[in-house]
Amino acid sequence: MPTSPFIDDLIRDRRTKRGFLDQPVPIEMVKDILSVAKYTPSSSNTQPWRCYVLTGEARERVTTAAVEAYRGAPEGLKPEYSYFPEPLHEPYATRFNSFRGQLGDAEGCCRSDITGRRRYVERQFRFFDAPVGLIFTMDRRLEWASFICYGCFLQNIMLAAKGRGLDTCPQGLWSLQHPVLRTELNLPDDQMVVAGMSLGWADNSMAVNQMSMSRVELEEFTTFVHE
């Protein structure tokens, strides 16, 4: 049976990285990644994605504004869309709590460490020091099918980046920053913020970048129907 070890390895080896080296990414490399990702399939070829690439002064301006907005919102920021149900039910709650526990250990903060948790969120809004920040928007008049297409698009970006030696962190949390992004990027009112993504060269000396989350076995999420 023919296989594609390179593709398989890319999928298995891709990890979310939450700390990056102070090393620039050539803009041509970013263009190459997005030029490959544009071949993502979408429902009836609607291609719902729109991407903003932040580097240099623009990245600094947006991240500074985002951190200031977070610090100035003691009641919390409001997302563009509902992220998780409350309360989160099983089996998802167990998986979520396992991840949060490992992340807290790697970041050196527990769930009760409010200061440490806020410091982590601020790192998110600095793109974890990655030299490239990506912001993704979508026409808010579109429906759920377009979110499915968008997930495929984001995965292709991450795989294309990994194939070039780069790493990424997809960040739904950036949907909380839609007022800042609307101002800083002059987003049209019909565009909703779907997510952000950090892109760069991972700093693998960081404990948080040593995390490796488990996956459930095939039999737990697959039903084979023969008749």
Swiss-Prot record:
Keywords, ordered alphabetically: Aromatic hydrocarbons catabolism, Flavoprotein, FMN, NADP, Nucleotide-binding, Oxidoreductase, Plasmid
Pfam families linked to this entry: Nitroreductase (PF00881)
GO molecular function terms listed in the Swiss-Prot or TrEMBL record: nitrobenzene nitroreductase activity; nucleotide binding
Reactions catalysed: N-phenylhydroxylamine + 2 NADP(+) + H2O = nitrobenzene + 2 NADPH + 2 H(+)
Tree of life domain: Bacteria
Pathway involvement of the protein, from the record: Xenobiotic degradation; nitrobenzene degradation; Xenobiotic degradation; 4-chloronitrobenzene degradation
Gene3D superfamilies linked: NADH Oxidase (3.40.109.10)
Cofactor: FMN
InterPro entries found in the cross-reference section: Nitroreductase, Nitroreductase-like
GO biological process terms held by the UniProt record: catabolic process
Family assignment from sequence similarity: Belongs to the nitroreductase family.
Protein name: Chloronitrobenzene nitroreductase
